[in-house]
Amino acid sequence: MTQFPAALNPHQDDILKMLACQTHLGGNNVDVEMESYTWKRKDNGHFIINLAKTWEKIQLAARVIVAIENPADISVISAKPLGQRAVLKFANFIGATAFSGRFTPGTFTNQIQSKFTEPRLLIVADPLLDKQPLMEASYVNIPTIALCDTTSCLDGVDIAIPCNNRGKNSIALMFWLLAREVLYLRGTIPRNTTWSVKVDLFIYRDTDEEPEKEKTAAVAAAPVAAVEAVEFTQQPIAEWSAPDN
């Protein structure tokens, strides 16, 4: 990190967050263009990403984002469900335009389409799943930033942020760090203070699993007799009698 001024070097907490979120864990394979971002290979075959390179690219990407005068001209996209919440929160804090879910083909190239837009910068969570917007951005000369794993192909990617883009915690942390750095550069928050927003706000949550977890916890906490009473108690049925003649 000697190429950075002391103020721009990552704090120990930032490195610990990356390790806790497994940002450094790559895949079993490595693309030839991603070899320079790897540190070593573990005995189990997984490549380890060099977090110093990750931090450098976060710094570079944040400065590119700040250079865009109108933040609404920045499009942030994630077709991957694990990155959709992070994309929405990131766009909300920096003022960008978020596209979560399926990307409509022709959004950047088909002018007769109702959703046609001309962004000045594109940010994607996965170059593989977000291949369509990356391809369209290359047609119309839109610079791109992407979260890239060791197996990611960098075709159409101008700035690759090496990280684990397969885990929800790692994706959330990358967008959180990028948003915080943008706010630092804009002067929205002082660099010597801690950002009040927690990483947890960016982490994907499965809304379908929450009711099931609550139900399971309630059943486990309730006494067995109470559960049996709830499940098997039946209202008494009045006896039928023939009407008097």
Swiss-Prot record:
Described purpose of this protein according to its UniProt entry: Required for the assembly and/or stability of the 40S ribosomal subunit. Required for the processing of the 20S rRNA-precursor to mature 18S rRNA in a late step of the maturation of 40S ribosomal subunits.
Record protein name field: Small ribosomal subunit protein uS2
Record localization: Cytoplasm
Broad class of the protein's primary localization: cytoplasm
Family label: Belongs to the universal ribosomal protein uS2 family.
GO cellular component terms, semicolon-separated: cytosolic small ribosomal subunit; extracellular matrix; phagocytic vesicle
GO MF annotations in UniProt: structural constituent of ribosome
InterPro entries named in the record: Ribosomal_uS2, Ribosomal_uS2_CS, Ribosomal_uS2_euk, Ribosomal_uS2_euk/arc, Ribosomal_uS2_flav_dom_sf
Assembly behavior: Component of the small ribosomal subunit. Mature ribosomes consist of a small (40S) and a large (60S) subunit. The 40S subunit contains about 33 different proteins and 1 molecule of RNA (18S). The 60S subunit contains about 49 different proteins and 3 molecules of RNA (25S, 5.8S and 5S). Interacts with ribosomal protein S21.
Pfam families per the UniProt record, alphabetical: Ribosomal_S2 (PF00318)
Keywords linked to the UniProt accession: Cytoplasm, Ribonucleoprotein, Ribosomal protein
GO biological process, one term: response to bacterium
